[in-house]
Design a protein with these regions (language model features):
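Nucleotide-sugar donor-binding/catalytic module of glycosyltransferases
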Residues: 1-153
């Protein structure tokens, strides 16, 4: 990835509550993106398990990571807490039991620099506890690129 491409900064907000089993895989998938200019915001929503310590560990090993520890107030409030401190040109939200393809933000960069969208919708796979894909959602690219007036109608 060349230096010019690294100029666009993406903030990634991960609200975290009681997902100790999945958290390292989630954070690892964000930290190891091929596109590096990321601000990663881990919002510990008062998680009662080992997640708070895991968040602090990740912040120690990667300086792109910021951690917010707060009293449990639910998913929406956790996302808003991350949004409050985000400094990126674009902001992405993922659930903390998700993991993403290592080239996701490289592809997002290509979309935002060629189409300048206000919103991007991602496809996803639902996997069971054994890692087997049980459902696929892939948005049709043509149907997800709208002009502002189309979105409001």
């Amino acid at each position: 990835m060349n230096e010019t491409k690294e100029k666009v900064k993406f903030s990634v907000v991960l609200p975290i509550y009681n997902v100790e089993k999945y958290l390292n895989r989630c954070i690892d998938s964000v930290v190891n993106q091929t596109y590096r200019n990321l601000e990663i915001i881990l919002v510990d929503d008062g998680s009662p398990d080992g997640c708070p310590a895991m968040c602090d560990y990740w912040a120690e090993v990667d300086n792109r990571i910021k951690v917010v520890h707060k009293k449990n107030a639910g998913l929406g409030e956790a996302r808003n807490s991350g949004l409050d401190i985000a400094t990126g040109d674009y902001i992405g939200f993922f659930d903390s039991d998700d993991y993403i393809d290592k080239k996701l933000f490289e592809e997002v960069y290509n979309i935002v620099t060629s189409k300048n969208p206000d919103l991007i919708e991602f496809g996803h796979y639902d996997v069971n506890k054994d890692g087997i894909v049980v459902k696929t959602f892939v948005p049709q690219i043509e149907s997800t690129v709208f002009e502002g007036e189309e979105v409001m109608s």
